[in-house]
Amino acid sequence: MLPLWLVLAGLLLAVGPAASHRGEMEPDSLASGDDDEDSDGDGPHGDRSEEPVYMHRAPYWTHPHRMDKKLYAVPAGNTVKFRCPASGSPSPSIRWFKNGREFRGEHRIGGIRLRHQHWSLVMESVVPSDRGNYTCLVENRFGRIRYSYLLDVLERSPHRPILQAGLPANTTALVGSDVEFFCKVYSDAQPHLQWLKHIEVNGSSYGPDGVPYVQVLKTADINSSEVEVLYLRNVTMEDAGEYTCLAGNSIGLSYQSAWLTVLPEEELVHEAETSEAKYTDIIIYTSGSLAVAMALIIVVLCRMQTQSSKQPLEPMAVHKLSKFPLIRQFSLDSSSSGKSSTSLMRVTRLSSSCAPMLAGVVEMDLPLDSKWEFPREKLVLGKPLGEGCFGQVVRAEAYGIDRQWPDRAVTVAVKMLKDNATDKDLADLISEMEMMKLMDKHKNIINLLGVCTQDGPLYVIVEFAAKGNLREYLRARRPPTPDYTFDITELHEEQLCFKDLVSCVYQVARGMEYLESRRCIHRDLAARNVLVTAENVMKIADFGLARDVHDIDYYKKTSNGRLPVKWMAPEALFDRVYTHQSDVWSFGILMWEIFTLGGSPYPGIPVEELFKLLKEGHRMDCPSNCTHELYMLMRECWHAVPLQRPTFKQLVEGLDKILAAISEEYLDLSMPFEQYSPSCEDTTSTCSSDDSVFTHDPMPLAPCLFSCPSGRT
């Protein structure tokens, strides 16, 4: 048996060199106390206990499966972290490159965080300028490896908080039970949330100013999911009522409400039994009614079939022209072969002593509408005012169209077909006429005054706007530049102030609010389709070309006609779906036109690039003359989610407050002025989307403003 001291000496000799060797190759790794998610063994020596010990080794990736994602597409404002966990012997170093150049903290506003012990690069609050190719280079004296990431930063539109639809939801509960209301909030800026309960004070739910009385139940910044839930324990009858989730950030407020109904247990059971009995009765009565209705329909159809086999088809007397089918396309060279189809109206060739023959058009024998019919002989046509896709507009004098003054001539505008019009063009003009008949008089739309449908070509008589369309009205009142000048004697009379521009926006919003109330989608709202009267009243035109949507809330355009691309909402542009919300988007573009005095939207951007930018969330910048409040209104109109855009009613209310608060400031027409890109002229026809604005012209600028002189009213 060996002495104890000899055994211990042998152990020391065996263990000592190995321990000493390990101490040279594995220095202690640095701790990371400020990034818990990185403390997972990704440090330069975090996994050393699981790997064999090498005296010398080139760098290698320790967690390659965590580096599969090469492309990072993140919204602006987020934090981005790139990681290249590696190891080697001796311990390698890591450097970062952006687009081929070494990347340091001073190269970026806001700086960067390089965590060498965790092989990571961290960038907080990324912005579009951070886009690029990021490469990590890991090396020691035995070799080097590299890996690249591609970062794309998507711009976000600043917006008020978005609340998830349907939350909070109406709830019915028993006395003594527990209730939870949920409210999901989406917001880029730090949101604040309050849960409110609506209460009564002195028997009234609203104060003298129309603001409801509420009790604040819960309020906090949203830092956890707990804040988005309202818990009501052991509810009583007094807890019944309306509850509101109110969320706000630096941009604005959003809220949604729900009702809590509290019932005694016996009442709930009774209601369930009563409801079941009612449903049974409804099913019985409905089934019987359907059986009787089906029998009647079968009898009527059989009788109609019998009569149609014995009698020739007679022309139908229908009041609404939209009930008539479209007549087939007519050609001068067509023969009367079996290709013709039966029409529900008498078809004749258009011929009139006061108008040339229209090529390729047959005339519909339209029924007389005594409410709107105007004697053709009392209409004196004048000079042309312009033309559109299928018709032309001429100035005219209508004698006696104002029934209060039967002998007085009123200046009007008359819509008629062009010489090269087709059957479809005639049907479109009739459709526009019928749409306008459905509208009541409104100050901010072009109103129908009369029609001429008998003994000649179709004339649609509408209000006359002396100052033309809004786009040209604004451009004619721009400050002079070397490339864009006008008569200096007109400056004082035509001088615009900031309040005038807001008034233009407000009036158009009022007109669209009315059209929205009549379930009319415009589909082509732009400054070129807003007319200006001699009294500077804004009137929306060409809404008759819109589709009436009584049954559905959207209209899908299926034809491949040319479209006003720059004014179209993304859902209309990419999916061809038109709603009142897509009109709101176009209204935002129109606002931009107004505050740039008729500038062309997205100047210098090709169509293909515009599609890409819209999908990425890019929006036009704020015009110089536009306040932040008005620009945020534009941005709300350009919200990517249609239902998150304001309604025209909300726009009118907001603009009314802005208009009442602002002072009148004139455009400074005496100072040097940068051009608005007058070379970026749009086509005069609303049919064309092939617009020269998509050439690379300079960005339009806006004029300076100065306080209006005293005496301005």
Swiss-Prot record:
Residues 1-20 form the signal peptide. Present in an inactive conformation in the absence of bound ligand. Ligand binding leads to dimerization and activation by autophosphorylation on tyrosine residues. It catalyses: L-tyrosyl-[protein] + ATP = O-phospho-L-tyrosyl-[protein] + ADP + H(+). It comes from Coturnix coturnix. The keyword Ribonucleoprotein does not apply. The gene is FGFR4. This is Fibroblast growth factor receptor 4. Residues 59-152, 161-261 form the Ig-like C2-type domain. The active site is at D524 (proton acceptor).
